[in-house]
Amino acid sequence: MGRFFRRRKYCKFTAEGVKEIDYKDLNTLKNYITDTGKIVPSRITGTSARYQRQLARAIKRARYLALLPYTDRH
């Protein structure tokens, strides 16, 4: 009775047919990091393992090139 329908998670990259996640696409990458700068795990975002690895690599590259912050502004 008290249950509610939970929407199924799906990989947006697989649905869109993305070949490679670009480290310069900051608008996409910002959706996958928290306010404190941590990478959001795939069990929360629904990203497949292949794209989660690409995502982590792209975020780390963007951080190294100072396109994304390592931590929040404190």
Curated annotation (Swiss-Prot):
Citing just one GO molecular function, the answer is: small ribosomal subunit rRNA binding
Under Pfam families, the record lists: Ribosomal_S18 (PF01084)
Q: Which domain of life is it from?
A: Bacteria
Gene Ontology annotations for the cellular component aspect, listed alphabetically: cytosolic small ribosomal subunit
Q: Which residues cross the membrane?
A: none
Q: Matching InterPro entries, A to Z? A: Ribosomal_bS18, Ribosomal_bS18_CS, Ribosomal_bS18_sf
Keywords attached to this entry: Ribonucleoprotein, Ribosomal protein, RNA-binding, rRNA-binding
Matching entries from SUPFAM superfamilies are given as:
Ribosomal protein S18
Q: Name one GO biological process term.
A: translation
Hey, which family's this protein in? Belongs to the bacterial ribosomal protein bS18 family.
The record's annotation in PANTHER family points to: 30S RIBOSOMAL PROTEIN S18 (PTHR13479), SMALL RIBOSOMAL SUBUNIT PROTEIN BS18M (PTHR13479:SF40)
- What exactly does this protein do? Binds as a heterodimer with protein bS6 to the central domain of the 16S rRNA, where it helps stabilize the platform of the 30S subunit.
Binding partners and assembly: Part of the 30S ribosomal subunit. Forms a tight heterodimer with protein bS6.
Protein name (Swiss-Prot/TrEMBL)? Small ribosomal subunit protein bS18
Q: Which classification does the entry list for the species?
A: Bacteria, Pseudomonadati, Pseudomonadota, Gammaproteobacteria, Chromatiales
